[in-house]
Regions:
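The beta1-alpha1 cofactor-binding region of Rossmann-like NAD(H)/NADP(H)-dependent oxidoreductases
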Residues: 39, 58-70, 101
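Residue(s) in the substrate-gating loop at a strand-loop-helix junction
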Residues: 138
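C-terminal helical subdomain
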Residues: 170-173, 177-178, 194-233
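Conserved glycine-rich cofactor-binding loop
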Residues: 13-15
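Active-site helix of classical SDR
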Residues: 119, 153-154
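Substrate-binding pocket helix/loop in short-chain dehydrogenase/reductase
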Residues: 95-96, 100-105
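A short, exposed helix-loop element centered on a Lys and neighboring polar residues
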Residues: 119-120, 162
Length: 233
């Protein structure tokens, strides 16, 4: 059995998650990706030529049983787990004073509970490989924005990353928070268009994720904030 490293990525069928998966597969690693849309996952796999090292798993990052099942399926398929990337997330793009609360619960569960569930489900496997946890946050988790509930969820992810690091470092497990600025991804689909100014690509963020993941043993890169030039906040 090959001993190529194995990574599980939530929300891996498009955007940053898909770009990370491509980079890792190109490097000879094995990858499992989860997503809610089976068609999107199938299309992503087909786009890559249905590689043997890719496992696609339909499921919600915010459902405990489905996250546990994804970890178990990854271990069954590949026999190990070296890294998890908590990438699934979205924004309702509204405000606490004027927004529609109907969408807030799902956003908070996906963006905040989702990473915590992934950590809990995978930690035993990561202890065995002295692996890594990568949380995809946002600069919105460092900068206050009026009324921004999405930003509040990313502040929570910023805190979760450091709190997790302080617990799991004793077991040789690394934790990295990747906090992108404006990125050209499906994140903006619900806003009617891309924001003004320069944007990063999903591939550029993926390069930062893979760089953090592939640090030498014993090196733990904890926080990486990546903005496009010209983004002031």
């Amino acid at each position: 059995m090959t001993e190529a490293p194995v990574t599980l990525i939530t929300g891996g069928g498009s955007g940053i998650g898909a770009a990370v998966a491509r980079r890792l597969l190109d490097a000879g690693q094995r990858v499992a990706v989860t997503g809610r849309g089976e068609e999107r996952l199938r299309a992503f796999s087909a786009e890559l030529g249905d590689p043997a090292g890719l496992l696609t798993l339909r499921g919600s990052a915010a459902e405990h049983t489905q996250v546990v099942s994804a970890v178990e399926a990854t271990l069954k398929e590949f026999g190990r787990l070296d890294t998890v990337v908590a990438n699934a997330g979205f924004a309702t793009h509204d405000s606490v004073a004027e927004g529609d609360p109907a969408g807030w619960t799902e956003m908070v569960l996906t963006n905040v509970l989702g990473p915590a569930l992934l950590i809990r489900a995978s930690i035993d496997a990561l202890k065995a490989t002295r692996g890594r946890i990568v949380l995809v946050g946002s600069v919105a988790g460092f900068v206050n924005t009026p009324g921004n509930i999405y930003g509040a969820t990313k502040w929570a992810v910023t805190g979760l990353a450091e709190n997790t690091r302080r617990e799991v470092t004793q077991w040789g497990v690394g934790v990295t928070l990747i906090a992108p600025g404006r990125v050209e991804t499906p994140f903006w689909d619900g806003t009617g268009g891309l924001p003004p100014g320069e944007l990063l690509t999903a591939g550029q963020i993926a390069d930062s994720v893979v760089w953090a993941m592939t640090q030498p043993a014993g090196v733990d890169v904890n926080t990486v904030v990546v903005r496009p030039l010209g983004q002031p906040n």
